[in-house]
């Protein structure tokens, strides 16, 4: 059963204060670290700017959507993100879930 992660993030003042050369070096490290993720079955479904024109839009500037074969694979990615120092530079929230269908989701909502 696939598992999913949605990230929402915005560069913070610490990131904005870095010279471009340091930002580039940091992002090169991220690129290198991400190169082996596909071998673990980790898929990037989307990385990009958020669309502020949608109803109830998030104030976050960027989003990432990921699919994982197991929760353990998801946790490997999250541990790598944390270890990289990413959270020092970006205001960031994560939302994770496994696969679910409409009927089970509606039943869960009804019980809340």
Predicted stretch roles:
Residues 17, 84-86:
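Charged, amphipathic alpha-helical segments and their flanking helix caps
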């Amino acid at each position: 059963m696939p598992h999913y992660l949605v990230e929402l993030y915005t560069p913070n003042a610490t990131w904005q204060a870095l010279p471009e050369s340091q930002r580039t070096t940091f992002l090169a490290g991220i690129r290198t670290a991400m190169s082996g993720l596909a071998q673990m079955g980790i898929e990037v479904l989307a990385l990009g700017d958020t669309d502020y024109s949608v109803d109830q839009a998030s104030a976050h500037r960027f989003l990432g959507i990921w699919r994982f074969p197991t929760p353990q694979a998801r946790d490997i990615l999250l541990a790598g993100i944390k270890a990289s120092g990413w959270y020092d530079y970006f205001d960031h929230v994560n939302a994770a879930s496994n696969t679910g269908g409409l009927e089970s989701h509606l039943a869960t909502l009804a019980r809340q």
